[in-house]
């Protein structure tokens, strides 16, 4: 949980830096921005699962509910999505709502994390929020009733899927994070295209894109391709990475992993070894084989992402 403590601390410092001051009387009831509606509903859903698990004495599941919400939904996505709107250059009309919702979620998250991690949460509650009452004796939050907006859920989940796919392409093809890319989108589904248009600035900022273009023709030769729902996306790689070198690198990695898998399979098919080796050793070998298979699949996916049509 050391990394989780750091995550909580960094989230708090980010809000402090961006002047997200907590108002104890604030309640996120009438929200305009879909990102805020999404995170509040995610928090409501987490509270429901948390209380169900606590009432059933499933403390491990309860801790997992909090961990996944705060790390994934709040830090990895919500904070990332609102960063461009909180920057000094931002002219977003939703900046006040972002500040209120982000601090409201953080404070109430500290309350439910407190029984599992009392020291860091009490410290932040006192130093950042100025709380005079200890979290351990304060009332736990209740779901904040707002419109359960499926439009918000569908919009943000699609946005997250698109950003994730772009991240995967960068990672698998070793494209430097700061390297500006062009995103091409090929699809006639107006709903998804309207979402992309709506969040274009956020997508470009988070994914380090120079532009987003809608096309009706095939992707250019040497484009990394992916699928997000019904959308086909492409990222032209010409001038970004050396395609020939990248193909050679990926094929070498695949051959290396295939040799590892072969060795693992030979040992696991050896009945003499299986009968004599401790169960722990056999299981570790199986885990290593499975990890190598997963790695091979990812390398093949990376190789297949590059479109080499002549």
What are these regions (language model features)?
Residues 12, 47, 51-54, 78, ...:
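A structural signal for well-ordered alpha-helices, especially hydrophobic packing surfaces
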Residues 127-310:
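C-terminal low-complexity, glycine/proline- and small-hydrophobic-enriched intrinsically disordered tails
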Residues 5, 43, 47, 66-71, ...:
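Short amphipathic alpha-helical coiled-coil/interface segments
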Residues 3-16, 36-45, 64-84, 226-229, ...:
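Core structural elements
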Residues 1-15, 64-68, 99-122, 194:
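Structured ligand/cofactor/substrate-binding pocket environments in proteins
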Residues 54-61:
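Short helix-adjacent coil turns
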Residues 22-51, 79-164:
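Acidic, turn-prone loop/beta-hairpin segments
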Residues 14-36, 224-233, 245, 275:
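Non-cofactor substrate-recognition interfaces
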């Amino acid at each position: 949980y050391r990394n989780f403590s750091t995550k909580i601390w960094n989230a708090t410092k980010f809000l402090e830096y961006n002047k997200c001051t907590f108002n104890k009387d604030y309640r996120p009831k009438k929200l305009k921005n879909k990102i805020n509606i999404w995170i509040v509903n995610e928090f409501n859903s987490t509270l429901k699962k948390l209380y169900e698990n606590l009432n059933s004495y499933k403390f491990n599941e309860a801790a997992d509910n909090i961990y996944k919400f705060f790390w994934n939904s709040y830090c990895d996505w919500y904070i990332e999505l609102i960063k461009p709107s909180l920057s000094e250059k931002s002219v977003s009309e939703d900046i006040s709502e972002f500040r209120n919702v982000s601090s409201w979620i953080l404070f109430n998250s500290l309350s439910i994390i407190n029984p599992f991690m009392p020291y860091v949460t009490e410290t932040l509650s006192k130093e950042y929020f100025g709380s005079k009452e200890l979290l351990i004796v304060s009332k736990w939050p209740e779901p904040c009733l707002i419109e359960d907006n499926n439009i918000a859920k569908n919009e943000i989940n699609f946005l997250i899927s698109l950003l994730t796919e772009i991240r995967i392409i960068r990672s698998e093809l070793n494209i430097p994070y700061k390297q500006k890319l062009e995103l091409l989108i090929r699809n006639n589904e107006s709903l998804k295209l309207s979402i992309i248009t709506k969040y274009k600035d956020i997508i470009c900022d988070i994914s380090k894109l120079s532009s987003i273009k809608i096309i009706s023709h095939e992707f250019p030769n040497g484009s990394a391709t992916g699928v997000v729902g019904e959308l086909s996306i492409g990222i032209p790689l010409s001038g970004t990475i050396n395609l020939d070198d990248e193909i050679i690198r990926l094929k070498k990695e695949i051959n290396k992993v295939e040799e590892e898998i072969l060795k693992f399979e030979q040992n696991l098919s050896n009945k003499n070894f299986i009968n004599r080796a401790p169960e722990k050793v056999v299981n570790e070998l199986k885990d290593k084989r499975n990890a190598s298979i997963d790695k091979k699949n990812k390398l093949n996916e990376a190789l297949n992402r590059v479109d080499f049509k002549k």
